[in-house]
């Protein structure tokens, strides 16, 4: 039954915030000061993960269909066939046109293949050097490998082959992807027919349709609507599911998912806002499936299958990896979160973390607690105010690429306990975000954590056990550094400790030219280890304002070399 569009808009305005928002380059500095900040916010439909199975025909209101409810932010701009914000909608189509007009030959081919292939097959390239093993051991296949030089017939079919086999060696992984991306509840057909927003190529002749698809797109039915993008939804459902099972490729896979969305704009199929909406639906649907009690055994089987010789132990170094560059991935992913839209709504809304969203990080940050993963999502979320993204629960503002880099801010004492015996990210991980906040980082456990950001958090660092690598000059932030056990490794020259340094035990590892700069007092003890490097008489290993104590043990010094303590430095002498 089709519902009245005006009635839908009225319900939306009552049930959800419809403010629109924008994205700065820097990670939002919002901090969860108490656990109350991390509590989920209930939408008109309840919580997405609890009611995702209601995304079916006949459920067409924000109250009885979580996808319709999540996407109801679009009613700020369009409903009942009328534009409510012509400027945003005009920008939406203008951006779509510009993107199609600047389409390169390689982008044309890629977007064509994205269009024709099974939606799930599209994400295999995100596996990079593991794609060869996946194709072999999942019996993955496609019947589209090149783009034709002439337009396809209007009735040309999509892929007819099974994308991968659920009875293959990687069957559990294939089944989990199918459960997420091909369930009766994962589609966008219902919400599209509620919103009824016309495709961009039918709104403006400036949107240049991909020539190979011109006949197909011209013949599409009139109710083949734009918002949200179904391909993008499926891309994030598939990409995030694969990322759960293969967290070693987390950021690469979600970057490919975002690229699939971009491919839809390149082909002229979808507008940027539709792609942004598709990311939201795909993210929420994946979290719902991964949280569903019925899928827990399959979820574990998929992870285990991926971590065998069938996939992660069969790396193909000769295979191409389109997602090997971290900075390129980061720039691409984060730009596609907002597609250049500026904030146009309430920019002062606190971050919201949806119920169950933390499951998306469970395998990527396995050493954190459930609440800590929610805190990561909170401190890496987008600011409010961007078009479409301010849904009631907070799915639109999740920045999972940044979240995979660990905390964005420390608002309290955060203890990270890593067990190296469990392997993977439990054994070693790197936080790349620029940490802010007034909280303290406490490193415990046997694993190794690397801090690689330009950090400004003021609560200091305490190392109790394991290894903490300072991989940027400002990795330790602005507070005191206390070394009570484990290994503190300085890997960058001229690393600065902005507070005091206090070593009671453990091992401080420096290079001959590290020149650790301690801004205030240093209290020395424990072991100093010098790594191999060029030795020069009189080199400053560290400087400080004042010093008490000396190292109890010094290792790594070649024969004939010594350390010399002065009022403000520790020197290498011969």
Feature-to-residue mapping (PLM):
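C-terminal segment of classical bacterial N-terminal signal peptides
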Residues: 20-30
């Amino acid at each position: 039954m089709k519902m009245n569009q005006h009635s839908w808009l009225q319900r939306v305005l009552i049930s959800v915030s419809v403010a629109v928002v924008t994205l700065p380059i820097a990670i939002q500095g919002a901090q969860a000061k108490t656990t109350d900040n991390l509590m989920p916010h209930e939408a008109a439909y309840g919580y997405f993960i609890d009611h995702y199975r209601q995304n079916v025909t006949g459920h067409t209101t924000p109250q009885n269909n979580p996808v319709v409810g999540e996407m109801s932010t679009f009613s700020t701009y369009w409903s009942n066939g009328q534009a409510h914000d012509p400027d945003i909608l005009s920008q939406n189509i203008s951006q779509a046109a510009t993107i199609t007009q600047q389409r390169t030959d390689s982008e044309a081919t890629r977007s064509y293949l994205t269009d024709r292939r099974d939606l799930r097959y599209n994400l295999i390239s995100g596996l990079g050097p593991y794609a060869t093993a996946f194709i072999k051991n999942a019996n993955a296949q496609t019947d589209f490998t090149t783009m034709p030089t002439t337009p396809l017939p209007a009735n040309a079919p999509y892929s007819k082959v099974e994308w991968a086999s659920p009875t293959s060696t990687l069957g559990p992984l294939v089944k989990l992807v199918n459960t997420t991306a091909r369930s009766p509840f994962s589609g966008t057909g219902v919400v599209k027919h509620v919103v009824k927003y016309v495709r961009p190529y039918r709104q403006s002749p400036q949107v240049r349709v991909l020539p190979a698809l011109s006949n197909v797109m011209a013949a599409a039915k009139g109710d083949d609507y734009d918002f949200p993008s179904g391909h993008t939804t499926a891309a994030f459902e598939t990409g995030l599911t694969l990322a759960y099972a293969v967290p070693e490729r987390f950021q690469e896979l979600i970057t490919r998912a975002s690229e699939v969305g971009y491919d839809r704009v390149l082909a002229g199929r979808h507008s940027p806002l539709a792609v942004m909406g598709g990311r939201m639906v795909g993210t929420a649907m994946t979290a719902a499936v991964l949280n569903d009690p019925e899928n827990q055994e399959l979820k574990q089987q998929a992870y285990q299958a991926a971590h065998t010789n069938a996939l992660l132990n069969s790396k193909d170094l000769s295979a191409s990896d389109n997602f090997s560059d971290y900075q390129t991935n980061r720039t691409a992913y984060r730009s596609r979160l907002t597609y250049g839209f500026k904030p146009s709504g309430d920019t002062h809304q606190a971050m919201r973390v949806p119920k169950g969203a933390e499951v998306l990080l469970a395998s990527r940050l396995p050493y954190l607690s459930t609440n800590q993963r929610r805190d990561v999502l909170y401190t890496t979320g987008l600011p409010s105010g961007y078009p479409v993204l301010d849904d009631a629960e907070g799915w639109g503002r999740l920045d999972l690429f940044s979240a995979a880099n660990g905390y964005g801010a420390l608002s309290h004492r955060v203890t990270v306990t890593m067990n190296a015996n469990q392997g993977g990210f439990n054994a070693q991980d790197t936080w790349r975000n620029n940490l802010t906040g007034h909280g303290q980082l406490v490193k415990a456990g046997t694993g190794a954590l690397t801090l690689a950001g330009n950090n400004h958090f003021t609560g200091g660092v305490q190392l109790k056990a394991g290894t903490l690598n300072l991989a940027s000059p400002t990795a330790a932030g602005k507070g005191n550094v206390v070394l009570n056990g484990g290994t503190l490794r300085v890997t960058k020259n001229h690393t600065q400790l902005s507070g005091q340094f206090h070593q009671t035990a453990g091992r401080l590892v420096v290079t001959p030219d590290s020149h650790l700069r301690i801004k205030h007092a240093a209290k020395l003890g424990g072991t100093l280890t010098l790594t191999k490097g060029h030795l020069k008489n009189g080199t400053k290993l560290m400087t400080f304002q004042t010093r008490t104590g000396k190292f109890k043990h010094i290792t790594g010094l070649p024969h004939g070399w010594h350390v010399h303590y002065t009022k403000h430095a520790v020197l290498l002498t011969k």
